[in-house]
Protein backbone atom coordinates (compact mmCIF):
# COMPACT_ATOMS: atom_id res chain seq x y z
CA UNK A 1 0.00 0.00 0.00
CA UNK A 2 2.99 2.30 0.47
CA UNK A 3 4.18 1.74 -3.09
CA UNK A 4 4.68 5.08 -4.83
CA UNK A 5 2.55 5.34 -7.98
CA UNK A 6 3.10 9.05 -8.65
CA UNK A 7 6.78 9.78 -7.92
CA UNK A 8 6.69 13.55 -8.53
CA UNK A 9 3.62 14.04 -6.33
CA UNK A 10 4.76 11.31 -3.91
CA UNK A 11 1.36 9.61 -4.07
CA UNK A 12 1.08 6.04 -2.83
CA UNK A 13 -1.24 3.24 -3.87
CA UNK A 14 -3.08 3.72 -0.56
CA UNK A 15 -3.79 7.35 -1.47
CA UNK A 16 -5.10 6.33 -4.89
CA UNK A 17 -7.45 3.86 -3.20
CA UNK A 18 -8.55 6.50 -0.68
CA UNK A 19 -9.26 8.94 -3.50
CA UNK A 20 -11.44 6.48 -5.41
CA UNK A 21 -13.35 5.62 -2.22
CA UNK A 22 -14.02 9.34 -1.70
CA UNK A 23 -15.36 9.96 -5.21
CA UNK A 24 -17.11 6.60 -5.66
CA UNK A 25 -20.61 8.06 -5.05
CA UNK A 26 -20.07 10.40 -8.01
CA UNK A 27 -18.59 7.68 -10.25
CA UNK A 28 -20.60 4.52 -9.76
CA UNK A 29 -23.96 5.57 -11.19
CA UNK A 30 -22.33 6.81 -14.37
CA UNK A 31 -20.03 3.83 -14.98
CA UNK A 32 -22.54 1.14 -13.96
CA UNK A 33 -22.94 -1.62 -16.57
CA UNK A 34 -20.33 -0.14 -18.89
CA UNK A 35 -17.56 -2.50 -20.09
CA UNK A 36 -14.47 -0.64 -18.97
CA UNK A 37 -10.93 -0.52 -20.30
CA UNK A 38 -7.98 -0.04 -17.96
CA UNK A 39 -4.51 1.40 -18.19
CA UNK A 40 -2.45 -0.08 -15.39
CA UNK A 41 0.81 1.29 -13.98
CA UNK A 42 2.08 -1.31 -11.49
CA UNK A 43 5.50 0.38 -11.38
CA UNK A 44 4.15 3.91 -11.20
CA UNK A 45 3.26 6.49 -13.83
CA UNK A 46 6.90 7.23 -14.65
CA UNK A 47 7.21 3.71 -16.07
CA UNK A 48 5.39 2.31 -19.07
CA UNK A 49 1.86 1.16 -18.29
CA UNK A 50 -0.22 -1.38 -20.14
CA UNK A 51 -3.69 -1.39 -21.61
CA UNK A 52 -6.12 -4.06 -20.43
CA UNK A 53 -9.60 -4.95 -21.66
CA UNK A 54 -9.88 -8.53 -20.46
CA UNK A 55 -10.38 -9.30 -16.79
CA UNK A 56 -6.97 -10.23 -15.36
CA UNK A 57 -6.11 -13.65 -14.05
CA UNK A 58 -7.16 -13.97 -10.43
CA UNK A 59 -10.20 -11.71 -10.76
CA UNK A 60 -12.43 -12.35 -7.72
CA UNK A 61 -15.69 -14.18 -8.49
CA UNK A 62 -17.75 -11.30 -7.10
CA UNK A 63 -16.50 -8.90 -9.80
CA UNK A 64 -19.21 -8.55 -12.44
CA UNK A 65 -18.14 -9.02 -16.05
CA UNK A 66 -19.70 -9.04 -19.49
CA UNK A 67 -18.36 -11.19 -22.31
CA UNK A 68 -18.66 -10.26 -25.95
CA UNK A 69 -16.63 -10.21 -29.15
CA UNK A 70 -14.02 -7.47 -29.54
CA UNK A 71 -13.37 -6.30 -33.09
CA UNK A 72 -9.91 -5.05 -32.17
CA UNK A 73 -8.87 -8.14 -30.19
CA UNK A 74 -10.63 -10.47 -32.69
CA UNK A 75 -11.88 -12.67 -29.87
CA UNK A 76 -14.33 -12.77 -27.00
CA UNK A 77 -13.27 -10.51 -24.14
CA UNK A 78 -14.43 -10.63 -20.51
CA UNK A 79 -14.93 -6.96 -19.72
CA UNK A 80 -15.09 -5.75 -16.14
CA UNK A 81 -18.16 -3.84 -14.95
CA UNK A 82 -17.52 -1.33 -12.16
CA UNK A 83 -20.89 -1.72 -10.48
CA UNK A 84 -19.87 -1.35 -6.84
CA UNK A 85 -17.31 0.18 -4.52
CA UNK A 86 -15.51 -3.12 -3.93
CA UNK A 87 -14.73 -3.44 -7.64
CA UNK A 88 -13.50 0.15 -7.84
CA UNK A 89 -11.20 -0.39 -4.84
CA UNK A 90 -9.97 -3.69 -6.29
CA UNK A 91 -9.06 -1.93 -9.55
CA UNK A 92 -7.21 0.81 -7.67
CA UNK A 93 -5.28 -1.88 -5.83
CA UNK A 94 -4.24 -3.26 -9.24
CA UNK A 95 -2.77 0.19 -10.03
CA UNK A 96 -5.46 0.68 -12.67
CA UNK A 97 -4.74 4.41 -12.64
CA UNK A 98 -6.83 5.20 -15.71
CA UNK A 99 -10.33 3.82 -16.21
CA UNK A 100 -12.05 4.41 -19.54
CA UNK A 101 -15.68 3.74 -20.38
CA UNK A 102 -17.74 3.48 -23.56
CA UNK A 103 -20.70 5.76 -24.16
CA UNK A 104 -23.14 2.83 -24.06
CA UNK A 105 -24.04 0.15 -21.53
CA UNK A 106 -23.94 -3.63 -21.91
CA UNK A 107 -27.70 -4.09 -22.20
CA UNK A 108 -27.79 -1.88 -25.33
CA UNK A 109 -24.20 -1.46 -26.47
CA UNK A 110 -25.17 0.12 -29.80
CA UNK A 111 -27.43 2.72 -28.16
CA UNK A 112 -25.24 5.26 -26.34
CA UNK A 113 -26.64 7.45 -23.59
CA UNK A 114 -24.06 10.21 -24.09
CA UNK A 115 -22.83 12.29 -27.00
CA UNK A 116 -19.19 13.31 -26.53
CA UNK A 117 -17.68 16.45 -28.04
CA UNK A 118 -13.98 15.99 -27.37
CA UNK A 119 -12.06 19.27 -27.66
CA UNK A 120 -8.47 18.48 -28.52
CA UNK A 121 -6.09 21.46 -28.90
CA UNK A 122 -3.07 20.95 -31.14
CA UNK A 123 -0.05 23.00 -29.94
CA UNK A 124 0.59 25.84 -29.78
CA UNK A 125 -3.16 25.87 -29.10
CA UNK A 126 -3.77 25.08 -25.46
CA UNK A 127 -6.38 24.54 -22.78
CA UNK A 128 -7.44 28.20 -22.87
CA UNK A 129 -8.26 27.79 -26.56
CA UNK A 130 -10.32 24.70 -25.75
CA UNK A 131 -12.22 26.84 -23.21
CA UNK A 132 -13.03 29.36 -25.94
CA UNK A 133 -14.41 26.58 -28.15
CA UNK A 134 -16.39 25.11 -25.26
CA UNK A 135 -18.10 28.47 -24.81
CA UNK A 136 -19.10 28.55 -28.47
CA UNK A 137 -20.40 25.00 -28.20
CA UNK A 138 -22.49 25.86 -25.16
CA UNK A 139 -24.09 28.78 -26.98
CA UNK A 140 -25.00 26.55 -29.92
CA UNK A 141 -26.30 23.72 -27.75
CA UNK A 142 -28.33 26.19 -25.67
CA UNK A 143 -29.87 27.47 -28.91
CA UNK A 144 -30.79 23.88 -29.78
CA UNK A 145 -32.38 23.33 -26.38
CA UNK A 146 -29.76 20.81 -25.28
CA UNK A 147 -28.10 20.77 -21.88
CA UNK A 148 -24.45 19.77 -21.87
CA UNK A 149 -22.02 18.96 -19.08
CA UNK A 150 -18.32 19.89 -19.27
CA UNK A 151 -15.34 18.15 -17.75
CA UNK A 152 -11.61 18.41 -18.16
CA UNK A 153 -9.96 15.52 -19.96
CA UNK A 154 -7.35 15.49 -17.20
CA UNK A 155 -4.74 16.46 -19.77
CA UNK A 156 -4.82 19.29 -22.31
CA UNK A 157 -8.43 19.20 -23.49
CA UNK A 158 -12.07 19.42 -22.51
CA UNK A 159 -15.02 17.07 -22.88
CA UNK A 160 -18.51 18.43 -23.48
CA UNK A 161 -21.00 15.64 -22.79
CA UNK A 162 -24.68 15.59 -23.74
CA UNK A 163 -26.87 13.02 -21.95
CA UNK A 164 -29.38 11.50 -24.37
CA UNK A 165 -32.18 8.98 -24.41
CA UNK A 166 -31.03 5.55 -25.51
CA UNK A 167 -32.88 5.76 -28.81
CA UNK A 168 -30.05 6.52 -31.22
CA UNK A 169 -27.25 4.55 -32.84
CA UNK A 170 -23.62 5.61 -32.87
CA UNK A 171 -24.05 6.54 -36.53
CA UNK A 172 -26.65 9.11 -35.50
CA UNK A 173 -24.74 10.51 -32.53
CA UNK A 174 -21.50 10.68 -34.51
CA UNK A 175 -23.22 12.53 -37.35
CA UNK A 176 -24.78 14.92 -34.84
CA UNK A 177 -21.40 15.65 -33.22
CA UNK A 178 -19.82 16.12 -36.65
CA UNK A 179 -22.48 18.60 -37.77
CA UNK A 180 -22.08 20.61 -34.57
CA UNK A 181 -18.31 20.67 -35.09
CA UNK A 182 -18.73 21.82 -38.70
CA UNK A 183 -21.02 24.62 -37.56
CA UNK A 184 -18.51 25.88 -34.98
CA UNK A 185 -15.65 25.59 -37.50
CA UNK A 186 -17.54 28.03 -39.74
CA UNK A 187 -17.83 30.43 -36.81
CA UNK A 188 -14.12 30.55 -35.95
CA UNK A 189 -10.78 29.77 -37.59
CA UNK A 190 -9.63 28.31 -34.28
CA UNK A 191 -11.65 25.12 -34.87
CA UNK A 192 -11.22 22.22 -37.27
CA UNK A 193 -13.99 19.66 -37.62
CA UNK A 194 -12.53 17.12 -40.05
CA UNK A 195 -10.43 14.16 -38.99
CA UNK A 196 -7.89 14.89 -41.74
CA UNK A 197 -7.13 18.25 -40.10
CA UNK A 198 -6.54 17.00 -36.56
CA UNK A 199 -2.81 17.77 -36.56
CA UNK A 200 -3.05 21.29 -37.93
CA UNK A 201 -1.04 23.44 -35.51
CA UNK A 202 -2.77 25.98 -33.30
CA UNK A 203 -6.23 24.52 -33.91
CA UNK A 204 -8.81 22.85 -31.68
CA UNK A 205 -10.31 19.70 -33.18
CA UNK A 206 -13.88 18.93 -32.17
CA UNK A 207 -13.46 15.17 -32.26
CA UNK A 208 -16.73 13.59 -33.33
CA UNK A 209 -15.14 10.19 -34.00
CA UNK A 210 -15.26 9.29 -30.30
CA UNK A 211 -18.96 8.64 -30.83
CA UNK A 212 -18.28 5.18 -32.23
CA UNK A 213 -18.68 1.61 -31.10
CA UNK A 214 -15.50 0.54 -29.33
CA UNK A 215 -14.34 4.06 -28.46
CA UNK A 216 -14.06 5.16 -24.84
CA UNK A 217 -13.58 8.24 -22.70
CA UNK A 218 -11.89 8.56 -19.34
CA UNK A 219 -14.49 8.29 -16.59
CA UNK A 220 -15.61 11.45 -14.76
CA UNK A 221 -13.46 11.87 -11.65
CA UNK A 222 -10.97 9.44 -13.19
CA UNK A 223 -7.27 9.83 -12.49
CA UNK A 224 -4.78 10.35 -15.30
CA UNK A 225 -1.23 9.09 -15.52
CA UNK A 226 0.31 12.55 -15.32
CA UNK A 227 3.10 13.65 -12.96
CA UNK A 228 0.64 15.82 -10.99
CA UNK A 229 -2.05 13.09 -10.67
CA UNK A 230 -4.58 15.18 -12.56
CA UNK A 231 -8.24 14.20 -12.65
CA UNK A 232 -10.83 14.33 -15.43
CA UNK A 233 -12.97 16.76 -13.47
CA UNK A 234 -16.67 17.58 -13.98
CA UNK A 235 -17.18 21.34 -13.97
CA UNK A 236 -19.91 23.92 -13.62
CA UNK A 237 -20.11 26.00 -16.78
CA UNK A 238 -19.12 29.12 -14.84
CA UNK A 239 -15.84 27.35 -13.99
CA UNK A 240 -14.97 26.89 -17.67
CA UNK A 241 -12.70 29.92 -17.88
CA UNK A 242 -9.37 30.59 -19.54
CA UNK A 243 -7.86 31.12 -16.08
CA UNK A 244 -8.64 27.54 -15.09
CA UNK A 245 -5.52 25.42 -14.78
CA UNK A 246 -6.34 21.75 -15.41
CA UNK A 247 -3.10 20.72 -13.72
CA UNK A 248 -4.52 22.16 -10.47
CA UNK A 249 -7.38 19.63 -10.52
CA UNK A 250 -5.65 16.69 -8.90
CA UNK A 251 -6.14 13.78 -6.53
CA UNK A 252 -5.46 16.22 -3.68
CA UNK A 253 -7.94 18.92 -4.71
CA UNK A 254 -10.83 17.25 -6.55
CA UNK A 255 -11.85 15.00 -3.68
CA UNK A 256 -12.41 18.12 -1.57
CA UNK A 257 -14.83 19.76 -3.99
CA UNK A 258 -18.19 20.09 -2.26
CA UNK A 259 -20.49 20.13 -5.29
CA UNK A 260 -20.87 17.52 -8.00
CA UNK A 261 -21.66 19.41 -11.23
CA UNK A 262 -22.79 16.14 -12.83
CA UNK A 263 -25.09 15.01 -10.03
CA UNK A 264 -28.19 15.16 -12.24
CA UNK A 265 -26.67 14.12 -15.57
CA UNK A 266 -28.48 10.77 -15.60
CA UNK A 267 -31.80 12.47 -14.91
CA UNK A 268 -31.52 14.75 -17.93
CA UNK A 269 -31.47 12.36 -20.85
CA UNK A 270 -32.60 14.32 -23.89
CA UNK A 271 -33.90 13.69 -27.37
CA UNK A 272 -31.75 14.75 -30.30
CA UNK A 273 -34.82 16.10 -32.09
CA UNK A 274 -33.46 19.56 -31.35
CA UNK A 275 -35.73 22.53 -30.75
Segment roles from a protein language model:
Residues 39-41, 148-154, 194-198:
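Short beta-strand
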Residues 1-18, 28, 32-33, 72-77, ...:
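C-terminal accessory nucleic-acid interaction domains of nucleic acid-metabolism proteins
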Residues 123, 128:
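Portal/gating segments that form or line small-molecule/metal binding sites
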Residues 1-92:
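Charge-rich, low-complexity segments
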Residues 161-173:
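Catalytic palm subdomain of template-directed nucleic-acid polymerases
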Residues 153-162:
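Short, conserved phosphate-binding/catalytic loop or strand-edge motifs used
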Amino acid sequence: MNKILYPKAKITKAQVIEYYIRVAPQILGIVKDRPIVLTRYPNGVDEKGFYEKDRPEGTPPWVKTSTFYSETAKRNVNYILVNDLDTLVWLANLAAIEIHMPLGRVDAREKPDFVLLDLDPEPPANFANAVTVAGLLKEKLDDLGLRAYPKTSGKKGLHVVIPIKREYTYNTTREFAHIIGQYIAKETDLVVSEFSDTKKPNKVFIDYTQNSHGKTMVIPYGLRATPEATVSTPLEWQEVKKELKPESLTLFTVGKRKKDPWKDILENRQKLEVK
